[in-house]
Swiss-Prot record:
Protein name: Ethylene-responsive transcription factor LEP
UniProt keyword Ligase present: no
Tissue: Expressed in germinating seeds. Present in young shoots, at low levels, especially in leaf primordia and developing leaf blades. Also detected in vascular tissue, mostly in xylem, of young leaves, petioles and hypocotyls.
SMART domains: AP2 (SM00380)
UniProt-annotated stretches for the region Disordered: 1-21, 74-110
Matches recorded under SUPFAM superfamilies: DNA-binding domain
Gene Ontology annotations for the cellular component aspect, listed alphabetically: nucleus
Length: 211
């Protein structure tokens, strides 16, 4: 039993020494780290540590101090070749990569006019005007065609006209032929006064535009 225990303990010590450079396990369970100076071939004692990783890190610090980027280390360092370490574990001493720089603020002014033009373009059904043709009669009896436009936006709808005004202002005059003269029967608007009677001295009737 004692022989078997000694062999397994020695095998464990060999595995620790093989895994990490410059690390040896002490009989009482702690780990010692030492390094050999490449110039003088002397061994330098680095201390005793509770874990093998701490002892391996002490070795790496001493090796990098002596040999620089040509050192053989236990852990991976970003400033050294990947093949220089005996493990793939990243060293705790290796600083994390810097965070990406923040995005530069945008200095472009907001084009409110462009936004308004896009919103008020003819593609918008809320802002498309509708035009209708309205036939109206002038007092001289000549017919003219007028157009007006309105928007279909319900929020801008005008209130209805009063009944007396709507029945009188937009009524068309009724013309009656009586022979040699013109006579008219029409409904007057409250906003306009009655037209003066036509004098017999004007043989051409209603000729407002001159001869």
């Amino acid at each position: 039993m004692n022989t078997t225990s000694s062999k397994s303990k020695k095998k464990q010590d060999d595995q620790v020494g093989t895994r990490f450079l410059g690390v040896r396990r002490r009989p009482w369970g702690r780990y010692a780290a030492e390094i050999r100076d490449p110039t003088t071939k002397e061994r330098h004692w680095l201390g005793t540590f509770d874990t093998a990783e701490e002892a391996a890190l002490a070795y790496d610090r001493a090796a990098r101090s002596m040999r620089g980027t040509r050192a053989r280390t236990n852990f991976v360092y970003s400033d050294m070749p990947p093949s220089s370490s005996v493990t793939s574990i990243v060293s705790p001493d290796d600083p994390p990569p810097p965070p990406p720089p923040p995005a530069p603020p945008s200095n472009d002014p907001v084009d409110y006019m462009m936004m308004f033009n896009q919103y008020s373009s003819t593609d918008s059904p809320m802002l498309q005007p509708h035009c209708d043709q309205v036939d109206s009669y002038m007092f001289g009896g000549s017919q003219s065609s007028n157009s007006y436009c309105y928007s279909n936006d319900s929020s801008n709808e005008l209130p209805p006209l009063p009944s007396d005004l709507s029945n009188s202002c937009y009524s068309q005059p009724q013309w009656t032929w009586t022979g040699d003269d013109y006579s008219s029967e029409y409904v007057h608007s409250p906003m306009f006064s009655r037209m003066p009677p036509v004098s017999d001295s004007f043989p051409q009737g209603f000729n407002y535009f001159g001869s």
